[in-house]
UniProtKB/Swiss-Prot annotation:
The name this protein goes by in its record: Secreted RxLR effector protein 67
Membrane-spanning residues: 114-134
Taxonomy, superkingdom: Eukaryota
Localization per record: Secreted; Host cytoplasm; Host nucleus; Membrane
UniProt family annotation: Belongs to the RxLR effector family.
Record comment regarding domains: The RxLR-dEER motif acts to carry the protein into the host cell cytoplasm through binding to cell surface phosphatidylinositol-3-phosphate.
Region (Disordered): 40-65
Induction of its expression: Expression is up-regulated at later stages of infection.
Membrane topology: Single-pass membrane protein
UniProtKB keywords: Host cytoplasm, Host nucleus, Membrane, Secreted, Signal, Transmembrane, Transmembrane helix, Virulence
Length: 137
């Protein structure tokens, strides 16, 4: 009987810690998508710059003298495969993750659901504590 209670307590503790929150937040998903887009941006710079207007003489002169500071930003084509891809969309709300500010996509848990979750977790911890104390005392 005590072994049965210990197994139930271990399962309850595992469920509590597993349900305490996602391993990766929506904010991290957005920033990772942005970081990946910027990495692929640098790799496929020529394919994106193909639709940009040609450099003027002064811009060419500047780019020769100040290669690091005056680099033109690539033309951003959002129908390019690196942007228009199912992985760049939010799994539930389905809006694109290539927005300039990832803070738009931060998932805010409501106070009511947070309060309910805290009460449930406190109840589970109380039940596990009493099961363990009954098993060992």
């Amino acid at each position: 009987m005590r072994l049965y209670i210990l197994v139930l307590a271990a399962i309850a503790v595992t469920l509590v810690f597993a349900s305490s929150g996602p391993a990766i937040t929506y904010h991290e998903v957005g920033t990772r998508a942005l970081r990946q887009a910027s990495i692929t941006d640098e790799k496929s710079d020529d394919s994106l710059n193909a639709q940009a207007p040609p450099l003027s003489k002064s811009e060419k002169r500047l780019s020769r003298s100040f290669r690091t500071t005056s680099r033109r930003l690539p033309y951003t084509n959002y129908y390019h495969p690196q942007y228009y891809h199912p992985q760049n969309y939010h799994p539930h709300y389905n809006y694109p993750q290539y927005h300039s500010s990832p803070h738009v996509y931060v998932h805010q848990e409501s106070k009511k659901s947070w309060f309910v979750r805290m009460i449930l977790e406190a109840g589970i911890f109380w039940a596990v504590f009493h099961c363990l104390s009954a098993a060992f005392c």
